[in-house]
Amino acid sequence: MPLAKHEWIITTDADCIVKKNWLFVLDLFIQQNNSEMVCGAVTYNCQNTFLHHFQQLDFASLQGATIGSFGISKPFMCNGANFAYTKKLFLNLKGFEGNNIIASGDDVFLLQKAVEQFPEKVSYLKSFETIVATKPLNNWKDLFHQRVRWASKTKVYKSNFSKILGLIVLCGNLGFIFLLFSLFSCFYSLASILYIIFFGILFLKFFVDYMLIQKTQKFLQTKSKYTLLSSFLYPFFSVAVAIYSLFGKYEWKGRRFS
């Protein structure tokens, strides 16, 4: 930070693609608002594979949750690939102090510090001109370890809202799996009732998820295939990630973390 010559720090990743007017629109937003921290949208540049489209849907849900949390004035998530803050705010928050031993998540922890101490200084810039595109992962193992790394940060979040929301999502996915397995272990009469309940819940979940994700993807100007299959697979993937993040180890940049 002492090497920074200007007041604003703007971050992205080396493999990201930014739009032509990214900095111009960001600067305009900063001048028009009394903000000292600005979060922006990130999406994937996908190829036509199930793995990439699965990540696109998952990531769109995270982006939707991010935008929604700002909409209800309870922001808890951001992405360092499209993030900006002032040097003054960074120093007032004592930077990344307090989360030095955590493998990743500097951006989220800095955001949550800012929301806790200076909520009026934190904003979300929802503009197509400032969407940053990054690359999805190309194999399931890397995707699993990435999501475990992301999930492992949740237990040290300062935001109780994010913890409660994560718990609700986990319980919902566990309930879906439990109900599914119950279909194959009950008597016929009970199973027929469970079938009705299961498919009713499945339809409701799919409909709500679809509407919210479609709204997010409309803003991101992305499209995903295999939506139904991804929605069916996601609860299993999500629960496995959550459990593994509590008890397992993961790899990141050639290093192992627990």
Give the residues covered by each predicted segment.
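Short, conserved alpha-helix that lines the donor NDP-sugar binding/gating region
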Residues: 1-2, 111
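Short aromatic/hydrophobic "clamp" motif used to bind/position activated sugar donors
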Residues: 9
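Long helical/loop segments within the catalytic core of UDP-sugar-dependent glycosyltransferases
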Residues: 12, 25-97, 151, 224-238, ...
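The conserved acidic donor/metal-binding loop of glycosyltransferases
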Residues: 13-17
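Acidic donor-diphosphate engagement hotspot in glycosyltransferases and nucleotidyltransferases
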Residues: 21-23
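Catalytic donor/gating beta->alpha subdomain of glycosyltransferases that bind UDP-sugars
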Residues: 30-63, 91, 97-162
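Membrane-embedded multi-pass helical conduit in multi-pass membrane proteins
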Residues: 165-249
